[in-house]
Regions:
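Hydrophobic aliphatic residues
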Residues: 20-23, 70, 74, 88-93, ...
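Flexible nucleotide-interacting loop at or near the entrance of a catalytic core
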Residues: 2-58
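Alpha-helical transmission elements in cytosolic ATPase-linked domains
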Residues: 2-5, 38, 69, 97, ...
Length: 273
């Protein structure tokens, strides 16, 4: 039994390493453009510190990739990276999600629950789409930043937390401040290091590398024979207006892989992209 347990554990370790490698590849920042290399330089400088970073950029540009890279290159890399999509959580639940709640704090609170700040202890919390967070939740996040303490919903006990905060938004927070939708003091606390992620339209020279990356990844995931893409097809992809950025580009490559033959041609791109 002991030998079997050891073998099972060994298999699990190998499987975990493979999974981490696979996940790592899925979250790589792909490209060699000047714009992307500038971002990499900033990440290398800021990652070893505990400085807060505000990552801005349009939808699908890869803001979460920047956050992951900062965490992975930080001294907190072995601790959790907890991601919270502030836009996906109803405003009445965001405080419970971030700070947890005590049993009986509200009707459905049947047990005490830790929030994301506690779950990220020793690591990093990534507040994605922070521009969509309610003002009351913003006030509590500000307190967590100032005092390194949180209080669960329905509780009065202060809980010390040790987390690094990274935030991202596709909104212009200065305009949100003018409209009274975002706290100016929180903005200044979060944006110690601002990083603007370039759109795909601003780094079209990365399209051949991105195409190759997604071709390999998607064909492997689907268990399909590897496909190629012609130079003319790449040129056609570089002409397009990528308003949906990397996310849209990946979807187009997936569509081309499914609908086209062994080699993706410029005609295929014109027809399906």
């Amino acid at each position: 039994v002991t030998i079997r347990n050891a073998m099972d554990k060994s298999t699990l370790v190998i499987e975990t390493k493979i999974l981490k490698k696979k996940i790592g590849k899925a979250y790589e920042m792909i490209g060699d453009s000047k714009a992307l290399n500038n971002i990499r330089d900033m990440i290398d400088k800021v990652a070893p510190t505990d400085a807060r970073v505000l990552i801005t950029g349009s939808n699908g540009s890869g803001k979460e990739l920047v956050a992951r890279e900062i965490h992975n290159k930080s001294q907190r890399a072995s601790a959790p990276l907890i991601e919270v999509n502030c836009a996906a959580i109803p405003s009445e639940l965001i405080e419970s999600e971030l700070f947890g709640h005590e049993k009986g704090a509200f009707t459905s609170a049947v047990a005490t629950r830790k929030g994301k700040f506690e779950l990220a202890e020793g690591g990093t919390i990534f507040l994605d789409e922070i521009g969509d967070m309610s003002l009351s939740a913003q006030a509590k996040v500000l307190r967590a930043l100032q005092e390194n303490k949180i209080t669960r919903v329905g509780g009065d006990k202060e809980i010390k937390v040790d987390v690094r905060i990274l935030a991202a938004t596709n909104k212009d927070l200065r305009k949100e401040i003018e409209k009274g939708e975002f706290r100016e003091d929180l903005f200044h606390r979060l944006s110690v290091i601002p990083i603007q992620v370039p759109s795909l339209n601003d780094r079209k020279e990365d399209i051949p590398l991105l195409a190759d990356h997604f071709l390999t990844m998607i064909c492997t995931d689907y268990g399909m024979p590897m496909k190629t893409i012609s130079k003319a097809a790449l040129a056609e992809l570089q002409k397009k207006d990528w308003t949906g950025n990397i996310r849209e580009f990946r979807n187009v490559i997936e569509r081309l892989i499914i609908l086209c033959g062994k080699e993706i041609t410029d005609k295929d791109v014109k027809q399906f992209a």
